Amino acid sequence: MTTGNFFREQYPKKFMGIDGKSMAYIEEGIGDPIVFIHGNPTSSYLWRNIIPHVGHLGRVIAPDLIGMGDSDKLDNTGPANYKFEEHCKYLYKLFENLDLSNVHFVIHDWGSALGFYWTQLNPKRVKSITYMEAITGPIESWQDWPEVARNIFRAFRSDAGEELILEKNIFVERILAGDGKLSEEDLEIYLAPYKIPGEDRRPTLTWPREIPIAGEPNYMVAIAESYAEFLSKSDIPKLFINADPGSILVGNQREKVRLWNNQREVTVKGGHFVQEISPDDIGGHLADFIASFK
């Protein structure tokens, strides 16, 4: 396993100004871009043990979403901030400035929604998509959400969410750290952007409120429906890395994506943060998939 210090030495962060804010990202290598997008509440550090498997195959790019990782926080934030549309604005401008084409996406959690939507908007610029524990479309009801997480996610979407996350930091300290697989060093790196109670933690609260579930929020349901319909028919090559037992891409959601066009499927061990459990298996499958385009 790659240590935090070694990873940061081998893949130092770069920074780019986007609308007055600094976006952090990793960029190493040459060739077609291999773009890793994390979700909530992680950062590009999520990919530390997977990136080395494919570094020789292209130009590795791994951003920290706005307000997360080493990217800047937004100013004067509240419940209206860090929504999907706002993340799109910053991330997609970064992509434009990096002049991306022939992209191999590697995406997880909310990073998947951001990558899927960009693919729908820019299909001729995407060469392949690898996804795991992803938001592959609207979730019809709470019965399709993991039972162990149902009550807490409903609480996040209620008035109790501010206390649970902005004050108690539940998403990072309980959900991410909950399986006990992270070292103290790894957990400290993930915790760093959210040390200060209050608005610094806002991204990790807004994200669960954006999940398109049981018809809400309406605009996210529409976006997820749209990209799911596009991806189900698109001939863009896809690699579905199925997590066993998994967490959110299970049951009905998993059966739906198994019908997507031009797709391979492999299975690795892990729950939602599968990169922390099976990075070498993921890295091996990813390397084989990307190498097949050479």
Stretch-by-stretch model annotation:
Residues T2-K14, I18, S22-I26, P33, ...:
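Flexible "cap/lid" subdomain of the alpha/beta-hydrolase fold that forms the substrate-access gate
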Residues D32-H38:
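Short beta-strand element of the alpha/beta-hydrolase
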Residues G39, I277-S278:
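Active-site helix-initiating loop/hinge in glycosyltransferases
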Residues N40-I51:
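The serine-hydrolase catalytic nucleophile loop
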Residues G55-D64:
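Active-site machinery of serine-nucleophile hydrolases
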Residues I282:
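Histidine-centered active-site loop/cap adjacent to the catalytic His
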